[in-house]
Design a protein with these regions (language model features):
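ABC family nucleotide-binding domain
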Residues: 1-123
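Glycine-rich, phosphate-binding/catalytic loops in enzymes
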Residues: 22, 98, 130, 144-145
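Short, flexible helix/strand-to-coil boundary loops that buttress conserved ligand/catalytic motifs
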Residues: 123-124, 138
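Conserved short hydrophobic beta-strand within the ABC ATPase nucleotide-binding domain
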Residues: 126-128
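Conserved beta-strand-loop-alpha-helix hinge in the C-terminal portion
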Residues: 133-158
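Long, low-complexity, intrinsically disordered segments
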Residues: 158-165
């Protein structure tokens, strides 16, 4: 399982290469193999020329690509992406989503958590949760998959918090 965090969670005093090596250290991968694997992962996300940079020397989109490289380093079949575009501008969000779509086309399962319906409908399947319960599980392109813009603003029912009985 590879995990992509919303806030990147890069270690500020480690280089990009060292950040991507972290899960490989915990997996007991020998140093030379760890270095080669991390370098290849950074090259895969277009950052092979910034191996020695520190995270604070990068844009938000570049930091998210490092987080993606770290998630890919162990070659997981499943990638869990928690709001991977939440802290990014729209252009960079499209780039990151494109990378995740490419990973899916290459055979990875990508589980993407989002509150953004415009992102969710790009998936093949949507599982929507409300109050911890599954309220929809199906084709992302089915009419019932689309959340109405005002769904969060529904009027409370009589007797619920904020209303008078």
């Amino acid at each position: 399982l590879g995990f992509i965090f919303q806030q990147y969670n890069l270690l500020p005093k480690l280089t990009l290469l060292e950040n991507v090596e972290v899960p490989l250290v915990y997996a007991g991968i020998p140093a030379a193999q760890r270095h080669a694997t991390a370098k290849a992962a950074l090259e895969r996300v277009g950052l092979g020329n910034k191996l020695k940079n520190l995270p604070n020397q990068l844009s938000g989109g570049q930091q998210q690509r490092v987080a993606i490289a770290r998630a890919l380093a162990r070659g997981p079949a499943v990638i869990l992406a928690d709001e991977p575009t939440g802290a990014l501008d729209s252009h960079t969000s499209r780039e990151v989503l494109g990378m995740l779509q490419d990973l899916h086309k290459q055979g990875n399962t990508v589980v993407l958590i989002t509150h953004d319906n415009s992102i969710a409908v790009q998936a093949e399947r949507i599982i929507r949760l409300e109050d911890g319960r599954v309220v929809y599980d199906g084709d992302a392109h089915a009419p019932e998959a689309v959340v109405q813009p005002n769904f969060m603003m529904a009027e409370p029912k009589a007797g619920e918090e904020g209303t008078q009985a």
